[in-house]
């Protein structure tokens, strides 16, 4: 970004409608509370609204922070080789005024995910977990020596 530190990158990140604070706009100035106290410049993944995709040997998992949405505001669909997660809520009041939020995420499913065994759950703290087991192919997946025809 050409403007660098003049404009905080948080404005362009995936924070779903959270308000800006003084430390977002001027992160390099010390706090008025104490010169030794300073807010963290980095937020944790669980607070950020950013998704995490894990593709292990046995399982494919998507973790998504949707704490601003109720279960009725969310929809999860599988279309062909993609999973689509959509969330939308109408205007309502929060700590910073009135806000409406909407997001749409689309992820490609690996070809070896068993689509009939996919599960999706929403935890009490607003973490959506989408996971599906991977089926093992008949082909030997070890990286030992094997002939190539």
Curated annotation (Swiss-Prot):
Q: Where does the record place it?
A: Cytoplasm; Nucleus
Annotated S-S bridges: none
Q: Which GO terms describe its biological process?
A: lens development in camera-type eye; negative regulation of apoptotic process; protein refolding; response to heat
**UniProt binding sites for Zn(2+) 2:** 96
Q: What residues bind Zn(2+) 1, as annotated?
A: 89, 91
User: What highest taxon heads this organism's lineage?
Assistant: Eukaryota
Q: Which residues form the sHSP domain?
A: 41-149
Coiled-coil intervals, chain numbering: none
Question: Which InterPro entries does the annotation name?
Answer: A-crystallin/Hsp20_dom, Alpha-crystallin/HSP_16, Alpha-crystallin/sHSP_animal, Alpha-crystallin_N, HSP20-like_chaperone
Pfam families documented for this protein: Crystallin, HSP20
Tell me a GO cellular component. Answer: nucleus
GO molecular function terms attached to this record: metal ion binding; structural constituent of eye lens; unfolded protein binding
Question: Keywords assigned by UniProt?
Answer: Cytoplasm, Eye lens protein, Metal-binding, Nucleus, Zinc
Q: Subunit info?
A: Heteropolymer composed of three CRYAA and one CRYAB subunits. Inter-subunit bridging via zinc ions enhances stability, which is crucial as there is no protein turn over in the lens. Zinc coordination is achieved at least by His-89, Glu-91 and His-96. Can also form homodimers and homotetramers (dimers of dimers) which serve as the building blocks of homooligomers.
What function does the entry list? Contributes to the transparency and refractive index of the lens. May act as a chaperone, preventing aggregation of various proteins under a wide range of stress conditions.
Family, according to the entry, reads as follows: Belongs to the small heat shock protein (HSP20) family.
Q: What is this protein called?
A: Alpha-crystallin A chain
Q: Which organism is it from?
A: Trachemys scripta elegans (Red-eared slider turtle)
Which gene is transcribed and translated to give this protein? CRYAA
